[in-house]
Amino acid sequence: MENALVDLKARSLGVPVYELLGGAVREELPLYWSHCGSYRLPRTAEMLGVPPITSLDDLVSLGKEVREKGFSALKTNIFLFEEQPHMHQPGFARSEGWPALNPERRIINSLKEQLAAFREGVGPELEILLDLNFNYRTEGFLTVCRALDDLGLGWFEMDLYDPAALARIRHALKTPVASCESLFGLRGFRPFFESQSMDVAIVDVPWNGIWQAMKIAGLAESFEVNVAPHNFYGHLSTLMSAHFCAAIPNFRIMEIDIDDVPWKDDLVTKPPLIQDGMLKIPEGIGWGTELNEEAIAAHPVKNTGDERKYDRGMG
């Protein structure tokens, strides 16, 4: 509701939203290809109509694609190439590894192979970010991250609700830690900043609202912490996050999902402009686009009947 009202206010003044936030301090935003490979695992790939990833060689090829399209970073999840390639995500649902949330040695070994394949594909310059989600507890995160700490990753991303536990993990590692995408409001973030729990604070702009997100970014700056938006949604969210990133000084990098349904661009009147892995700051008034109601109506939500079958995750 807040973001809709801010859009209306900006439109009434004939300005982009970022002008209401103090103006843009940059004209384009570096992007990282989020969930890289996740949506190309067999079950999801079929829904999107793209060739499925079934081997480490496929990850090498995907890494080359990321590099060739100009992105400066990618973020991946935990994949297991077993009977059927799938995501390992015990922190989200009743699946393998839940509820104990303890990493097995085979998971760590598989992760090393996965990250090595991506590194071979992207080359030495691009950043690789690893999202561990809610998949472990403090001990498990430490076990996994220590085993991967010498790989030169851009960050480990993880979610914990205890700021002291997250701070303990961060101070035990060389690799930066990103977190807090699931937090809401200034008061939710404050104890994590006070505990020096993360290097990069991930802020969800649609969920928090643009004004609250700006306050969180301001508080982060006072603790010398960079900010990155949580943006695995659609184009409207991407544009909201772009205005946010344009206006804050302590911006790190912006998340975006590249693999998606082929009609995604049809849902808005003006999709985000991406060139060589960079997002151009929207120039139109308000958020810079409008919803295409006809296109939305043409693609209603479908109940596939398997929404609660989490045994093999997204794969």
Where are each of the predicted segments found?
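Short, small-residue-enriched loops and turns at beta-alpha junctions
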Residues: 80-86, 102-108, 128-139, 155-163, ...
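Shared catalytic-loop signature of beta/alpha-barrel
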Residues: 146-155, 161-290
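Conserved hydrophobic beta-strand within the GNAT/NAT acetyltransferase core sheet
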Residues: 76, 128-132, 179, 229
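Acidic active-site catalytic centers that drive phospho-/nucleotidyl reactions
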Residues: 2, 7, 75, 131, ...
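Generic anion/oxyanion-binding catalytic loop in active/binding sites
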Residues: 48, 130, 202
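N-terminal capping/lid subdomain adjacent to the active-site entrance of alpha/beta enzymes
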Residues: 1-127, 135-142, 147-150, 266-315
